[in-house]
């Protein structure tokens, strides 16, 4: 019985010796251990519109995309009707202008909506809506933004304009030519002190944010244009028009104003 138990527990029970553990000489080979820092990579977007191989919306219209076309700036025959992206140099300049103007329009649309939202939330702001601001700004002592003369109260719109020119000129000069904020690597996306939130550190997320910035900027430019047209026609800001439309969608819409203009009246 004891012999049977020994035979069962022996590694050479099946007639072939089983190697239980590697020998010391095998352990001490000349292997090398490398350690690397595991950085959590942000997962690329699952959205079909902002990834690198984005679906082109005009895919049915033009089968062949031009060589200069990326996902963000489709330069197919249908997408660039004015042939603005025909030359590569002009396309690069137009892309730079699109990104810069898109960032400005995104801020402007946010400000136009925010002022109307503040007025709707019963905050007593003396400044008018975005539509009527130009008329009020030229009048003397009208640029009291928070309706309290002690906070921000500019007597002259020209003084505000001069300060804006100086400040924006300095920032743009640093962005193009470098300066105390650091050297310029890419003037369109400067990074460094211009990127205080560190949004551009991960290259994949940065590439996706570039596409989102251009797409949302185009929407913001178009919606800002729509805000101006609405204000010219109705004399109200965007949020007031939206509230009127939601209150009575049948009567308060663009068609009611479009049929309102009778020549000679």
Swiss-Prot record:
Organelle targeting sequence: 1-34
Ligand binding (chlorophyll b 3): 156, 172
Binding site for chlorophyll a 5: 212, 230
Binding site for chlorophyll a 4: 216
Record's subcellular location: Plastid, Chloroplast thylakoid membrane
Post-translational modification (record): Photoregulated by reversible phosphorylation of its threonine residues.
Binding site for chlorophyll b 5: 164, 261
Alphabetized Pfam families for the sequence: Chloroa_b-bind
A GO cellular component annotation in the UniProt record: photosystem I
Residues passing through the membrane, by range: 151-171, 219-239
Stated family: Belongs to the light-harvesting chlorophyll a/b-binding (LHC) protein family.
Free-text note on domains in this protein's UniProt record: The N-terminus of the protein extends into the stroma where it is involved with adhesion of granal membranes and post-translational modifications; both are believed to mediate the distribution of excitation energy between photosystems I and II.
Protein name as catalogued: Chlorophyll a-b binding protein 1A, chloroplastic
Organism (species): Solanum lycopersicum (Tomato)
Gene of this entry: CAB1A
